[in-house]
Amino acid sequence: MSTRTDHYAVIGNPIAHSKSPDIHARFAAQTQQDLKYDRLLAPLDGFLASVQEFIRNDGKGLNVTVPFKLEAYAMASRLSERARAAGAVNTLKFENGEMLGDNTDGVGLVTDIVRNAGVAVAGKTVLLLGAGGAARGVILPLLHEKPARLVIANRTHSKALDLAERFAPQPTLEVSDFGALDDAFDIVINATAASLASEVPPISPRVFAKRTLAYDMMYGAAPTPFMQFAAEHGATVRDGLGMLVEQAAESFYVWRNVRPETAAVFKELRDKL
């Protein structure tokens, strides 16, 4: 009796650059799971139709990337707690006529910081730069780690305040604008898009110290401008490649109930950058 290979994909626009198929192919081989994983380019005005067609063709799950995470959130028939907190979905699972929406970005970030970088979040001071979708997706998993302080800083103070109020009451959660930051933090996370424009958020170098881990959600072959700035002021730096691999591993677990090992996949991707 032959078994059907389960079908997954990453959906977005653009999508050709996505490393997700490579990551999931390695996870599948490692865990001996019978699946295929493709890239799916959806028209900017055709996300819903693309997902429906994927389901009709017996697709089992999707990773969702830019610019469709909010549409996926609205479309899901059931949401995980972390997806609800994020207000966005990066993982869809189709099962028994239901569409489960999840968000694995935050747990990917936390796993990379705590397990891979070996830096505890518990009891630490954490600065989160940015108040957009990338920041919103990681706040709940960071709070679950019980930091001493989690400060959301943004160019527009009111936007940081609006974001913090979604998680209120949280006595450890604070807001700031970039210019008001004057203390050193244990962990500084760049969730802005500044690195895409080869810029650095306008923050004081005093947020960095020798003990600081400066983490940029972006990644590339060379350190980002944020990482360069942080390193010049004494911080240890790390980019977001590990977050990419760890959020993929969490999606794989949501779909298959099997947790893959990530270290070898991370090393392979790093070597190819």
Swiss-Prot record:
Keywords: Amino-acid biosynthesis, Aromatic amino acid biosynthesis, NADP, Oxidoreductase. It catalyses: shikimate + NADP(+) = 3-dehydroshikimate + NADPH + H(+). It is an enzyme of class 1 (oxidoreductase). Shikimate binds at residues 18-20, 65, 90, 105, 219. Signal peptide: none annotated. NADP(+) binds at residues 81, 130-134, 154-159, 217, 240. GO terms for molecular function: NADP binding; shikimate 3-dehydrogenase (NADP+) activity. Pathway: Metabolic intermediate biosynthesis; chorismate biosynthesis; chorismate from D-erythrose 4-phosphate and phosphoenolpyruvate: step 4/7. Its EC number is 1.1.1.25. It comes from the Bacteria. GO terms for biological process: amino acid biosynthetic process; aromatic amino acid family biosynthetic process; chorismate biosynthetic process; shikimate metabolic process. CDD domains: NAD_bind_Shikimate_DH. It holds the Pfam family Shikimate_dh_N. One of its GO terms (cellular component) is cytosol. The active site is at residue 69. InterPro entries: Aminoacid_DH-like_N_sf (IPR046346), NAD(P)-bd_dom_sf (IPR036291), SDH_C (IPR041121), Shikimate_DH (IPR011342), Shikimate_DH-bd_N (IPR013708), Shikimate_DH_fam (IPR022893), Shikm_DH/Glu-tRNA_Rdtase (IPR006151). Involved in the biosynthesis of the chorismate, which leads to the biosynthesis of aromatic amino acids. Catalyzes the reversible NADPH linked reduction of 3-dehydroshikimate (DHSA) to yield shikimate (SA). Homodimer. This is Shikimate dehydrogenase (NADP(+)). The gene is aroE.
